[in-house]
């Protein structure tokens, strides 16, 4: 039996040139199938940020798409665009910050941004309206780490009100939280 493997050179210092990462794409496929079987009908988002943690985002994303992932997630717009350029059509969620000025690209390439605050939501909405479109966003709630997101943990009522305000903005389409 021939196993399909993908070897990805890693960016290393001169002292670490002997290291590499090798991914068995069949094992990745089988692992995803196992998770999907446990999840039942729950849609799964495959996180392929940071080049799938150095293992080849495009190759890994193609496996996840073939196996029925509902979404792909990346850390930045450049990673999302790389997946689109490779022909991946699944919804893509950017987990990191996206500048509102990039709204036209998000709209054109059907890429979803994470939205962390009402000011960010307003800025994205304004930028989208300026080009006659809507940006898809998932609202990010801070549920405990205290780092980023609508502050549900510290002021639930105020954060919920802000999230609802974001959902009503004319330049946003909010398919998720």
Locate the predicted segments by residue.
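Short, Lys/Arg-enriched N-terminal segments with co-localized hydrophobic residues
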Residues: 1-9
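Active-site-proximal beta-alpha core segment in soluble small-molecule metabolic enzymes
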Residues: 14-15, 19-22, 27-29, 40-176
């Amino acid at each position: 039996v021939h196993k399909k493997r993908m070897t990805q050179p890693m960016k290393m210092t001169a002292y670490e040139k002997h290291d590499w990462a090798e991914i068995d794409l069949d094992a990745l496929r089988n692992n995803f199938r196992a998770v999907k079987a446990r999840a039942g009908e729950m849609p799964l988002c495959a996180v392929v940020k940071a080049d799938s943690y150095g293992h080849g985002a495009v190759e890994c994303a193609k496996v996840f798409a073939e196996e029925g992932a509902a979404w792909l997630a990346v850390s930045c717009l450049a990673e999302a665009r790389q997946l689109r350029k490779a022909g991946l059509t699944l919804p893509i969620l950017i987990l990191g910050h996206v500048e509102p000025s990039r709204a036209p690209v998000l709209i054109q390439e059907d890429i979803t941004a994470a939205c962390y605050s009402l000011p960010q939501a307003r800025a994205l909405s304004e930028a989208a309206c300026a080009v006659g479109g809507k940006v898809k966003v998932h609202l990010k709630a801070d549920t405990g780490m205290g780092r980023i997101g609508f502050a549900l943990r510290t002021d639930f009522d105020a954060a919920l009100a802000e999230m609802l305000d974001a959902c009503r903005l004319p330049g946003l389409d909010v398919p998720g939280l």
